[in-house]
């Protein structure tokens, strides 16, 4: 290999999210607010007089019992033995089990002392009644599934690991904590096989960077509408057609038909909200049920831009005019839009814009939108597309009363996903509120609602350290806002909670498909 390319394989592995290190996973687990870990990297002689040292990755307390945790990646070579012998992980867990039983009394006393010290210092500690503290004699193995794509080989590997671990379940406990995208893909494909999609078949065509290919998680073109909750299937397609909205990931390049992708966040958003878009009371209950809303809302207003009267939620909403220098708004394509939109008045009679951004299994690698090139000959390295974006949005950010201003926006957080979307949507809502000429949806205020499953750790718990000092997506974004209460992150199940009793059939469908 030529010397100048020698670092390529190493960098590919370094920046490949499937190759995230065990230490990085461990650090992310510790930094999360829940569960709280009492200790990490605990090391101790196996027993008095022994030279052998044993080490646990994490220690926590559950139900007044000390739990010792070993962490492994799904791809770790120690999880399986290539020639069929007992894998190293089994021997390792057996050693942990014997160590805990041998030293249980000493471990309880040690951790009582550590607990009191951390409590005195005001450090995070798990809930516990120290007088009742005992020890769980079975160590717990946490396996992090870092796979981003599902293959038959990977499924076989996971099944073999589970089979071997189950044979030793009397000695230790284990859990595979997955990559949310991978887990949801498995759930959706299982539902597809179980006729949840009314007999729809996978194997549809997806047109992506690698051209046109068939995938088992893409519905066949004739089954595409079965990607929707049954009562909305015909109406949602008509809505997009009548309002001139292009579909994301459409079965055809012209955006005229819905996506057959069963993990589409656009489809997920519509399945959650489209059914209630004309139910004024349901929409009001929905937004007043969101914890942390900066106002209490009195009335939901119909959205004038819709093709039919009486719509209280709009989808792929754009502004009535070009506020962001984007060469004209087109719903669903090539401009800033919001996945869903609600228009309301508060108890004081003042109008609010409520743009909703919807995420499902998305996660993002580092990609600087301010340094992107145009495609074509002679464009590489000129950052033409990035410079266009900088010229389009930088002045708007500098005049914003919500976004923190920076001395230079090249490579900044505002031009990295998912923040690039959030930045543009914030400017979108702010510019409409500030405009004296806005006649379609004039408003005095806005609140930005970001819907994302709380289990999507690759998106929410990622440390965007290249562009932020804060850990996690929510903290990183709120650090860039002057009024943090105008941004609300919520799980879709929590969003729909006010409708559990009034829309049982809808919520049962959503629970079966999305909330497991």
Where would I find each of the regions flagged by the language model?
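Charged, terminal alpha-helix-loop-beta segments
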Residues: 1-516
């Amino acid at each position: 290999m030529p010397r100048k390319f020698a670092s390529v394989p190493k960098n590919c592995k370094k920046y490949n999210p499937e190759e995230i290190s065990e230490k990085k996973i461990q650090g992310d687990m510790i930094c999360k607010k829940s569960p709280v870990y009492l200790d990490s990297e605990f090391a101790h002689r196996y027993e008095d007089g022994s030279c052998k040292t044993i080490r646990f990755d994490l220690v926590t307390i559950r139900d007044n019992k000390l739990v010792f945790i070993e962490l492994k990646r799904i791809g770790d070579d120690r999880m399986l033995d290539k020639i069929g012998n007992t894998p190293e992980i089994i021997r390792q867990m057996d050693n942990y089990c014997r160590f805990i039983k041998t030293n249980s009394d000493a471990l309880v006393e040690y951790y009582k002392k550590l607990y009191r010290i951390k409590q005195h210092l005001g450090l995070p500690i798990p809930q516990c009644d120290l007088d009742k503290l005992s020890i769980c004699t079975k160590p717990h193995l946490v396996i992090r599934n870092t796979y981003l794509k599902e293959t038959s080989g990977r499924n076989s590997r996971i099944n073999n690991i589970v089979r071997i671990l189950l044979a030793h379940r009397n000695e230790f406990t284990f859990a595979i904590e997955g990559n949310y995208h991978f887990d949801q893909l498995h759930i959706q494909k299982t539902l597809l096989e179980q006729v949840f999609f009314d007999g729809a078949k996978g194997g549809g065509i997806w047109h992506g960077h690698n051209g046109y290919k068939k995938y088992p998680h893409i519905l066949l073109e004739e089954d595409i509408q079965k990607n929707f909750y049954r009562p909305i299937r015909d109406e949602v397609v008509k809505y997009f057609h009548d309002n001139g909205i292009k579909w994301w990931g459409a079965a055809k390049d012209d955006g005229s038909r819905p996506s057959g992708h069963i993990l589409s966040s656009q489809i997920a958003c519509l399945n959650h909200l489209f059914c209630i878009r004309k139910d004024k009371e349901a929409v009001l209950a929905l937004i007043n049920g969101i914890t942390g809303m900066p106002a209490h809302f009195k009335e939901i207003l119909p959205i004038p831009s819709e093709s039919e009267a009486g719509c209280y939620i709009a989808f792929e909403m754009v502004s009535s005019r070009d506020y962001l220098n984007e060469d004209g708004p087109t719903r669903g394509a090539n401009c800033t839009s919001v996945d869903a939109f609600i228009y309301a008045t508060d108890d004081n009679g003042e109008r609010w814009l409520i743009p909703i951004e919807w995420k499902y299994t998305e996660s993002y690698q580092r990609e600087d939108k301010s340094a992107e090139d145009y495609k074509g000959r002679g464009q590489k390295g000129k950052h033409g597309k990035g410079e266009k974006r900088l010229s389009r949005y930088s002045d708007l950010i500098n005049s914003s009363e919500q976004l923190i201003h920076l001395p230079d926006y090249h490579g900044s957080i505002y031009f990295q996903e998912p923040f690039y979307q959030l930045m543009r949507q914030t400017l979108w809502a702010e510019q409409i509120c500030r405009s004296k000429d806005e006649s379609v949806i004039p408003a005095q205020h806005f609140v930005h609602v970001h819907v994302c499953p709380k289990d999507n750790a690759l998106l929410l718990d990622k440390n965007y350290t290249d562009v932020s000092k804060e850990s996690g997506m929510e903290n990183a974004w709120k650090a860039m806002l002057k009024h943090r209460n105008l941004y609300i992150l919520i799980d879709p199940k929590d969003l729909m909670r006010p409708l559990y009793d009034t829309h049982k059939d809808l919520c049962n469908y959503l629970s079966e498909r999305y909330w497991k």
